[in-house]
Amino acid sequence: MIRLRVKEVAKEKGFSQGRLSRVANIDENTLKRIYRDPFAIITTETLDKLARALGVPSSELIEDVPDK
């Protein structure tokens, strides 16, 4: 199972949710959903936009967690 680490990385980089939404040019509601649900399904395009905005490789925004 893949877990998104967007919220954690954004916090480490000093990004508020609103600022990240603007810089990444993604809908604020999409980002809210990602923040609420780290297992949300997103497009690779959205993942790439978030990674570029945060200045990290996209691989840093995902984590493989074992199924329970």
Report residues per predicted region.
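Residue-level detection of the helix-turn-helix DNA-binding "recognition helix"
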Residues: 11, 25, 36-39, 66
